[in-house]
Amino acid sequence: MENKPVTLDQAIQRGNTTITEVQLRKPQAGELRGLNLADVLQMDVNALIKLLPRITTPSLTEAEVGNMDSADLLQLGSKVAGFLMPKKMGYLAA
C-alpha cells in the first residue's frame, strides 16, 4: 500500500512553520489504547483528536487536530479507517 502524504486544504500554522502536508502511518495496537475501534472506524471526532497526534508526521497536537478544517479532518479520518480494514476486504487506503 502506497502511503502518500495528505495535502491539507487549510494549512496549520505552528509558530513560524506552516504545515501543508501530513504523513500518516498505520497505527500499531498500542497506539489504539484507550480508544474504541468502532469510534475510530466511524471517524468519531473525539477518537481522531486522540489518535492523529500519535500517527502523524509532523506530529500534530490534539489542539491542532481540534482546530483543523473539517474537510482535512475527514481526509485524515478516511485514511485512518482504510488502514484498519483487512486487506482481504479489498479496500486499501489511498
Where are these regions (language model features)?
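Short, surface-exposed, charged amphipathic helix/loop patches that serve as local interaction elements
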Residues: E2-A94
